[in-house]
Amino acid sequence: MKKISGIIIFILFIIALTYLNNNEIIVEKEETKLIKCIDGDTAKFLYNNEEIKVRFLAVNTPEIGENVEPYGEEASKYTCDRLNSAKKIELELDQESDKYDKYNRLLAWIFIDGELLQLDLVSQGYAEVKYIYGNYKYLNELKIAQETAKNQKIGIWKEK
């Protein structure tokens, strides 16, 4: 009986490993290379040897283009300047988040020279905490930064 239960446990372990490998939710930071900055919360990076569009997890910056919103251009310029001047860029996926959004963009935390870009954008008043569908890893820090930016009426919070 002990032999059979040992075999069953081993088989379940192998099945669990296979399941985890197939879903590929990597929670460690992975170094990447910027291909193109698109706007304040989206960019293209080289990820797993592929050019992929990445949506910055848990934040939203004002729109640019035809439907430009207040601080949209400033947020986009700030983000692009930060990304273009970075010595090291890393992506980190969040196990509480979907891997892709409805537009098939990878959802990730972005680190520039060790600093969380989303936290910087929220602190500077260029982004708001948005699209929260789980208990994301850096959510508490983002919420605190947003409250501080709101109280100080920085950036997008000047008018609100």
What are these model-predicted stretches?
Residues 2-160:
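Small beta-barrel nucleic-acid-binding modules, primarily SNase/OB-fold domains
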